[in-house]
């Protein structure tokens, strides 16, 4: 069997045997809202207790609270969920949509293309098993979350988001876990608890969007805006030469496990319609598309043959399937195309290049631009959000911030205001490839021209020298852009510019971008962002290895790296790792210094006359943790450090020592040259 068939067979096995995928020592919990059917799923990471040895031989047990984190996986992380990809996820938002009484079920699909696909018996083996009738706004009604928000209505979706964004931080005990720096938010409203009213006001103002098509009731409400947690999008989708429906469903599930807040289906191969149906029905997160890709397939890949009628039918087709947001390159105008002539890499956006070719071949303005108001009317009937594509984005750092890029940005600013006339939620897409020193001006210009509509960027990549590592080169720029105010980051995988990403590439891209987004949340001063960092740092200092792994973004990889060099069970509780060994772990030394100073303080107290005559039961020996708050004297610390200095010199002044197979240092028999660092299977001349 070929590797191509093996991959597809593996994906088929995965989705047919799909069970909830839980992270180690994590629990799915639900936070309740104001109504019984408003239950917000979160992931709670349980921690072990910290054990403090007291000088009298007793052990103090300190309880470490569970840490609540944002969970994108929906039913895929719920052990009580009944998962069947052939039936799709539970339509838990259906009742919220119906109770508003502003939508109606259609007798059948409206798109001519969908009608043709349904009439083709040859597609039965690919078709989703549980197709439902589509829903649309009643005549004269608008059903967008922005429409409700502007009328002062707080929807269940808005309340759900407020609970989700707060991550139950009000229950975190004050102390070491809640300490944080003030942060620099660059004008964003960061710091106060998120309320449902705040969510409503931000959506009404256009500073945030809630991408939720009325035909995607399986999706859990989430929000994109610079005054909320930074979100991450993952791209999946088949191509004309690779991938299958099974593989794309597998990537969808995998994406939500590793933190994708939204997923874009960028399929360009055969069976785009069928693939998308499977993805939407099984997605707990909003799904985005680039409709021009499918429209191009309908005209056999000839850009010049595209027209408004084909594109409009594609929008209706996808809206009735449940696509939550469309990327539309309506800002690519005929007069902007010549501006790219002197670029090093020209027009690199697929959608942008398609529309540029159409404009030149017809010598007319883009039909996307000319029919933009009709696009808005259609989106308002299904609550499809718009993501205004940056077709003129730079494809290399040499082309960053040029005339074409910023001319299009100004046009996108004009279009977002038109969309708001129709109460259509809108975000703006951004670059691309931008060196670090040119990133901030992108955010500043976007805020200026687009009236604070949410910004959504692909990175940007900060250097072009690392094919195969562009999740690193772009993660740097993504963290910066998000700090300055970007609301959502589109991930880049190691395969960027090289090929279609597989399952492992999706994970690597998401981990890189979750790091970037989280780093930006901390830098902005988001009140709950640093709790997880503090919990992990405390676990690291206390050598609670399992808690270190489990609090991280990727517990499996962290555990595997540790166990490569110290696989023994004893190493799981050891107060050192293979980096420094038991003698020179800086955190272990610090603990010993604190314990020594605390012991000296206790002895000094006992030596005092009043205490010497007192009943010993009246004397409480404080723990290192308690002593830390009182702080040792400079003399105590100096004495302890001098003792450690003597120990270091007596052991040969070597920074590192070899570790035998049991993981225990044996310095007495170590005759190694001090200029060679030795750890298992590693030898570095130093």
From Swiss-Prot:
<feature type="binding site">
    <location>
        <position position="329"/>
    </location>
    <ligand>
        <name>substrate</name>
    </ligand>
</feature>
<feature type="binding site">
    <location>
        <position position="577"/>
    </location>
    <ligand>
        <name>[4Fe-4S] cluster</name>
    </ligand>
</feature>
<protein>
    <recommendedName>
        <fullName>Phosphomethylpyrimidine synthase</fullName>
        <ecNumber>4.1.99.17</ecNumber>
    </recommendedName>
</protein>
<comment type="function">
    <text>Catalyzes the synthesis of the hydroxymethylpyrimidine phosphate (HMP-P) moiety of thiamine from aminoimidazole ribotide (AIR) in a radical S-adenosyl-L-methionine (SAM)-dependent reaction.</text>
</comment>
<dbReference type="InterPro" id="IPR002817">
    <property type="entry name" value="ThiC/BzaA/B"/>
</dbReference>
<dbReference type="Pfam" id="PF01964">
    <property type="entry name" value="ThiC_Rad_SAM"/>
</dbReference>
<feature type="binding site">
    <location>
        <position position="433"/>
    </location>
    <ligand>
        <name>Zn(2+)</name>
    </ligand>
</feature>
<dbReference type="GO" id="GO:0051539">
    <property type="term" value="F:4 iron, 4 sulfur cluster binding"/>
</dbReference>
<feature type="binding site">
    <location>
        <position position="235"/>
    </location>
    <ligand>
        <name>substrate</name>
    </ligand>
</feature>
<feature type="binding site">
    <location>
        <position position="497"/>
    </location>
    <ligand>
        <name>Zn(2+)</name>
    </ligand>
</feature>
<keyword id="KW-0456">Lyase</keyword>
<feature type="binding site">
    <location>
        <position position="580"/>
    </location>
    <ligand>
        <name>[4Fe-4S] cluster</name>
    </ligand>
</feature>
<dbReference type="GO" id="GO:0009229">
    <property type="term" value="P:thiamine diphosphate biosynthetic process"/>
</dbReference>
<feature type="binding site">
    <location>
        <position position="293"/>
    </location>
    <ligand>
        <name>substrate</name>
    </ligand>
</feature>
<keyword id="KW-0004">4Fe-4S</keyword>
<dbReference type="GO" id="GO:0009228">
    <property type="term" value="P:thiamine biosynthetic process"/>
</dbReference>
<comment type="pathway">
    <text>Cofactor biosynthesis; thiamine diphosphate biosynthesis.</text>
</comment>
<feature type="binding site">
    <location>
        <begin position="349"/>
        <end position="351"/>
    </location>
    <ligand>
        <name>substrate</name>
    </ligand>
</feature>
<dbReference type="GO" id="GO:0008270">
    <property type="term" value="F:zinc ion binding"/>
</dbReference>
<feature type="binding site">
    <location>
        <begin position="390"/>
        <end position="393"/>
    </location>
    <ligand>
        <name>substrate</name>
    </ligand>
</feature>
<keyword id="KW-0949">S-adenosyl-L-methionine</keyword>
<dbReference type="Pfam" id="PF13667">
    <property type="entry name" value="ThiC-associated"/>
</dbReference>
<keyword id="KW-0784">Thiamine biosynthesis</keyword>
<dbReference type="GO" id="GO:0016830">
    <property type="term" value="F:carbon-carbon lyase activity"/>
</dbReference>
<dbReference type="InterPro" id="IPR037509">
    <property type="entry name" value="ThiC"/>
</dbReference>
<keyword id="KW-0479">Metal-binding</keyword>
<keyword id="KW-0408">Iron</keyword>
<dbReference type="GO" id="GO:0005829">
    <property type="term" value="C:cytosol"/>
</dbReference>
<feature type="binding site">
    <location>
        <position position="429"/>
    </location>
    <ligand>
        <name>substrate</name>
    </ligand>
</feature>
<dbReference type="InterPro" id="IPR038521">
    <property type="entry name" value="ThiC/Bza_core_dom"/>
</dbReference>
<comment type="similarity">
    <text>Belongs to the ThiC family.</text>
</comment>
<feature type="region of interest" description="Disordered">
    <location>
        <begin position="659"/>
        <end position="686"/>
    </location>
</feature>
<dbReference type="InterPro" id="IPR025747">
    <property type="entry name" value="ThiC-associated_dom"/>
</dbReference>
<keyword id="KW-0862">Zinc</keyword>
<feature type="binding site">
    <location>
        <position position="456"/>
    </location>
    <ligand>
        <name>substrate</name>
    </ligand>
</feature>
<comment type="subunit">
    <text>Homodimer.</text>
</comment>
<feature type="binding site">
    <location>
        <position position="585"/>
    </location>
    <ligand>
        <name>[4Fe-4S] cluster</name>
    </ligand>
</feature>
<keyword id="KW-0411">Iron-sulfur</keyword>
<feature type="binding site">
    <location>
        <position position="264"/>
    </location>
    <ligand>
        <name>substrate</name>
    </ligand>
</feature>
């Amino acid at each position: 069997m070929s590797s191509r068939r093996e991959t597809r067979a593996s994906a088929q096995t995965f989705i047919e045997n799909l069970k909830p995928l839980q992270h180690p020592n994590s629990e799915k919990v639900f936070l309740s809202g104001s109504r019984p059917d408003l239950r917000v799923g979160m992931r709670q990471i349980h921690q072990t207790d910290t054990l403090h040895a007291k000088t009298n031989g007793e052990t103090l047990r300190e309880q470490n609270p569970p840490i609540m984190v944002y969970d994108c996986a929906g039913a895929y992380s719920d052990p009580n969920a009944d998962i069947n990809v052939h039936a799709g996820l539970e339509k838990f938002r259906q009742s919220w949509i119906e109770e508003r009484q502003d939508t109606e079920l259609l007798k059948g699909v409206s798109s001519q293309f969908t009608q043709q696909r349904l009439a083709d018996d040859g597609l039965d083996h690919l078709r989703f098993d549980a197709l439902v009738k589509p829903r649309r706004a009643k005549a004269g009604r608008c059903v967008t979350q922005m429409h409700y928000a502007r009328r002062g209505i707080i929807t269940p979706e808005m309340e759900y988001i407020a609970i989700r964004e707060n991550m139950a931080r009000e229950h975190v005990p004050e102390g070491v876990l809640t300490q944080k720096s003030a942060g620099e938010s660059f004008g964003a409203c960061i710091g106060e608890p998120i309320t449902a009213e705040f969510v409503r006001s931000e959506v009404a103002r256009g500073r945030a969007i809630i991408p939720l098509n009325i035909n995607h009731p399986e999706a859990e409400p989430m929000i994109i805006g610079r005054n909320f947690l930074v979100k991450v999008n993952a791209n999946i989708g088949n191509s004309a030469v690779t991938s299958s429906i099974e593989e794309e469903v597998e990537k969808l599930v995998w994406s939500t496990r590793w933190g994708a807040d939204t997923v874009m289906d960028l399929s360009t191969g055969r069976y785009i319609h069928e693939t998308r149906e499977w993805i939407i029905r099984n997605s707990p997160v909003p799904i985005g598309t680039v409709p021009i890709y499918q429209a191009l397939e309908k005209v056999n890949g000839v850009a010049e043959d595209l027209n408004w009628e084909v594109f409009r039918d594609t929008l209706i087709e996808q809206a009735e399937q449940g696509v939550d947001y469309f990327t539309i390159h309506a800002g690519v105008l005929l007069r902007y195309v010549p501006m790219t002539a002197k670029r090093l890499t020209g027009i690199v956006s697929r959608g942008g290049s398609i529309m540029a070719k159409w404009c030149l071949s017809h010598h007319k303005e883009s039909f996307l631009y000319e029919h933009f108001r009709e696009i808005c009317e259609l989106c308002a009937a299904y609550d499809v959000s718009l993501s205004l594509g940056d077709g003129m984005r730079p494809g290399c750092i040499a082309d960053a911030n040029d005339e074409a890029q910023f001319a299009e940005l100004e046009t996108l600013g004009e279009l977002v205001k038109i969309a708001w006339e129709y109460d259509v939620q809108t975000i703006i897409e951004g670059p691309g490839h931008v060196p670090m020193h040119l990133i901030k001006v992108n955010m500043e210009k976007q805020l200026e021209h687009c009236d604070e509509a949410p910004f959504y960027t692909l990175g940007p990549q900060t250097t072009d020298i690392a094919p195969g590592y562009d999740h690193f080169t772009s993660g740097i720029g993504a963290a910066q852009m998000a700090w300055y105010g970007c609301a959502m980051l589109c991930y880049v995988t190691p395969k960027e510019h090289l090929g279609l990403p597989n399952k492992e590439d999706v994970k690597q891209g998401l981990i890189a971008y979750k790091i970037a987004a989280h780093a930006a949340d901390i830098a902005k001063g988001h009140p709950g962002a640093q709790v997880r960092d503090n919990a992990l740092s405390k676990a690291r200092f206390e050598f609670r290895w399992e808690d270190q792994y489990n609090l991280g973004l990727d517990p499996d990889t962290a555990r595997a790296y540790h166990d490569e060099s110290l696989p023994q069970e004893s190493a799981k509780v050891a107060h050192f790792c293979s980096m420094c060994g038991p003698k020179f772990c800086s955190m272990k030394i610090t603990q010993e210094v604190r314990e020594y100073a605390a012991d000296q303080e206790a002895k000094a107290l006992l030596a005092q006359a009043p205490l010497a005559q007192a009943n010993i039961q009246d004397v409480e020996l404080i723990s290192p943790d308690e002593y830390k708050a009182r702080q040792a004297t400079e003399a105590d610390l100096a004495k302890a450090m001098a003792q450690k200095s003597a120990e270091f010199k007596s052991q040969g002044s070597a920074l590192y020592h070899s570790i035998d197979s049991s993981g225990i240092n044996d310095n007495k028999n170590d005759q190694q040259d001090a200029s060679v660092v030795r750890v298992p299977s590693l030898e570095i001349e130093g």
